[in-house]
């Protein structure tokens, strides 16, 4: 969604091998805006279709860390609060400026828009990751970071009449939980179903049910299906398996 063609200027590519670009894209000088840093003025060519026009204008603001909760052994929910309302669409993300990291990090939101200014992120620890090292090991409740957003076009379409299918794995849980919560709040599940599939490596990596269970219709119109690829040899896992 953030693909563009560089016409003139210089930039730094933060992730040269990002899977969002094909070899054809690279030959044509295309880049991913979320993985680039401008080194000066740029001229670019990008799609300007109506789907890329922000429904909510991104805004930079200061956010205070208000709470941390463990979801699994390596997945945590970080709750930030801003002075202004948290205005975003279910499924969108925001950029966090973390102290000492140098570059912003993009993290999906897990909650829904609210007037209390609460922004919830469900983030998985990345081994040797600079951003998650700060979040997991350095940042304390009460500390402030920069927050820029919202961004993203993969948000909940409330006008689609079909059932909703959410597929997530790892920290990809966050945007799907946001979409499920948004669908429930909008009353979309009164006449349709939501199927939520969560893939994990082992049983201890599974989560998501606790976030979905409070929603109206859970177990009836909301179906949660966890799947693991390494169930173990003890026979304790009784759920679905797959690769």
Regions inferred by a protein language model and the residue ranges of each:
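Short, surface-exposed secondary-structure boundary micro-motifs
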Residues: 7-10, 47-49, 99, 150
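Ferredoxin-reductase
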Residues: 53-143, 162, 200-202, 227-231
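Histidine-anchored nucleotide/phosphate-binding helix
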Residues: 177-187
């Amino acid at each position: 969604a953030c693909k563009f063609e560089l016409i003139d200027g210089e930039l730094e590519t933060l992730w040269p091998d990002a899977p969002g670009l094909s070899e054809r894209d690279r030959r044509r000088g295309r880049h991913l805006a979320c993985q680039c840093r401008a080194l000066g003025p740029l001229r670019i060519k990008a799609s300007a279709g109506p789907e890329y026009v922000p429904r909510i204008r991104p805004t930079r603001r200061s956010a205070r860390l208000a709470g941390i909760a463990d979801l699994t052994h390596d997945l945590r929910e970080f709750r930030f609060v801003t002075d202004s309302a948290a205005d975003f669409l279910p499924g969108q993300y925001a950029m966090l400026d973390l102290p000492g990291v140098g570059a912003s990090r993009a993290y999906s939101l897990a909650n829904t828009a609210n007037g209390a200014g609460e922004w919830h992120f469900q983030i998985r620890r990345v081994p040797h990751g600079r951003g998650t090292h700060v979040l997991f090991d350095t940042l304390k409740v009460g500390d402030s970071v920069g927050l820029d957003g919202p961004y993203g076009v993969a948000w909940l379409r409330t006008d689609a009449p079909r059932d909703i299918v959410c597929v997530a794995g790892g920290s990809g849980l966050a945007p799907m939980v946001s979409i499920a919560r948004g669908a429930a709040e909008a009353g979309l599940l009164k006449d349709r179903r939501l199927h939520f599939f969560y893939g994990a490596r082992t049983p201890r990596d599974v989560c998501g049910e606790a976030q979905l269970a409070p929603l109206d219709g859970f177990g009836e119109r909301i179906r949660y299906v966890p799947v693991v690829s390494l169930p173990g040899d003890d026979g304790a896992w009784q759920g679905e398996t797959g690769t």
